[in-house]
């Protein structure tokens, strides 16, 4: 068993990183009379709305959190809000600090809310103005719960709001009187009198010696500070960007209280930590958008649409039906590859959306409960650590007939065999992106109604005598 595993690991490691290949398929003698190939199986395509997706589980945190209002000219409006708990820093300021608040010897200078950008996950036009706000949560979160993208939390008092240009991010900031080099960050500042007058600080966190308890433990802090909601206001001047931030994965994100005494200047940071609940809430509105008539179950949807629409967040998934596998003459599937082609020149599309399609696609099926789970071929590829080599699904640029096209190719050999054998009773497979909760990108694929670049299933099989 161990030796077999070593051999398999070697074979997977030597598989091409661009195109998926099934081990053994390249040694099948296609000249044998019992080995046949076909690419003419009937396929039907459509686009479907996704159910909620998981955006928080304490054992498996996201590394990036989307935030914004995006009005996509094809997909319609998408909104993402961040809800997160803050936690204490671990070291409590000296008790003298709190004793001197009521006498005025310790004074709050400003409150700075910092979030580290994850610019690699931005989608849209980052040279833009965004009205971004931080609110205090009016209800508590629970780090023992699992939260989904359709969960949300009520916003209470406004903490801070500013109009920002995300392309002009800070990499230098002042912390405790020192200028510090940081990753790209967003800084929202509540200064001077505004900070001192805010009830969170004047009545709780910066009141007098009684405030000391809220710096001692997370339990005490969460009694008075449920957490924060970060969102882009619907009134924002432009709605063509989805930003992304790092919370617990950042060394700088948090809420900083800057203060001074007659002899010292310092700060205290409330942090986002892996112990705190943190999640994103998504909303999608396709009403009136070009994509609406293509969505399964919304209009008079018919299989064989010209386009398939796939989006990150809680956005649309593609659906492929393979209804007529019975014509394959009792086959043993050697290889089955589903090929999809990126659509070009879609009317009304915008360059900075079209030119940043999804880099990796996944295929799923519905289980008995109606939940999407990945197909067997993808599960095997993940288990052996060879996603693109064994399953594929990565975006590949190639030239066919002197035309540059972008394609995704995915192995579905095991899944197709299970369909033929009756193990899988549904003829549907669903197309989505990897790490959907952390991506706002989207792809438009030519559907089965396209005359040239329709999805194609290339199958090589042996007739089972």
Spans of features found by a protein language model:
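Secreted, disulfide-rich extracellular signaling modules
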Residues: 2-465
């Amino acid at each position: 068993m161990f030796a077999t595993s070593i051999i398999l690991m070697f074979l997977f490691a030597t598989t091409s990183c661009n195109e998926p290949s099934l081990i053994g398929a390249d040694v099948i003698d296609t000249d044998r009379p019992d080995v046949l190939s076909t690419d003419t199986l009937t396929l039907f395509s459509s686009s479907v709305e996704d159910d909620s997706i998981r955006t928080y589980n304490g054992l498996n945190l996201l590394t990036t959190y989307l935030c914004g209002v995006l009005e996509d000219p094809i997909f319609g409006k998408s909104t993402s809000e961040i809800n997160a708990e803050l936690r204490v820093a671990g070291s409590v300021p000296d008790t003298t600090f709190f004793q001197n608040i009521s006498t005025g010897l310790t004074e709050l200078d400003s409150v700075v809310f910092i979030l580290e950008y994850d610019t690699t996950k931005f989608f849209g036009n980052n040279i833009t103005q965004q009205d971004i706000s931080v609110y205090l949560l009016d209800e508590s979160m629970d780090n023992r719960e699992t939260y989904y993208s359709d969960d949300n939390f009520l916003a209470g008092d406004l903490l801070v709001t500013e109009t920002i240009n995300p392309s002009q991010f800070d990499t230098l900031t002042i912390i405790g009187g020192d200028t510090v080099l940081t990753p790209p960050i967003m800084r929202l500042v509540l200064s001077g009198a505004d900070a001192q007058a805010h009830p969170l600080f004047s009545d709780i966190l910066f009141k007098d010696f009684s405030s000391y308890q809220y710096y001692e433990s997370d339990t005490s802090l969460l009694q008075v500070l449920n957490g924060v909601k970060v969102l882009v206001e619907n009134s924002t001047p432009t709605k063509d960007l989805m930003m992304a931030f790092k919370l617990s994965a950042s060394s700088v994100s948090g809420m900083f209280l800057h203060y001074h005494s007659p002899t010292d200047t310092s700060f205290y940071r409330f942090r986002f930590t892996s112990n705190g609940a943190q999640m994103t809430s998504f909303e999608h509105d396709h009403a009136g958008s070009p994509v609406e008539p293509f969505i399964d179950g919304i209009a008079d949807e018919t299989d064989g649409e010209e386009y398939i629409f796939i989006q990150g967040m809680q956005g649309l998934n593609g659906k492929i039906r393979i209804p007529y596998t019975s014509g394959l003459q009792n086959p043993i599937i050697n290889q089955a590859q589903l090929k999809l082609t990126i659509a070009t020149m879609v009317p009304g599309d915008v360059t900075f959306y079209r030119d940043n399609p999804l880099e990796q696609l996944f295929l799923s099926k519905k289980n008995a409960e109606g939940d999407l789970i990945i197909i067997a071929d993808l599960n095997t590829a993940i288990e052996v650590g060879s996603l693109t080599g064994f399953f594929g699904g990565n975006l590949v640029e190639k030239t066919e007939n002197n035309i540059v096209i972008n394609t995704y190719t995915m192995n579905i050999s095991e899944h197709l065999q299970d369909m033929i054998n009756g193990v899988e009773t549904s003829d549907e497979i669903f197309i989505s992106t990897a790490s959907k909760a952390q991506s706002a990108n989207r792809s438009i694929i030519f559907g089965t109604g396209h005359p040239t670049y329709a999805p194609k299933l290339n199958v090589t099989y042996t007739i089972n005598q």
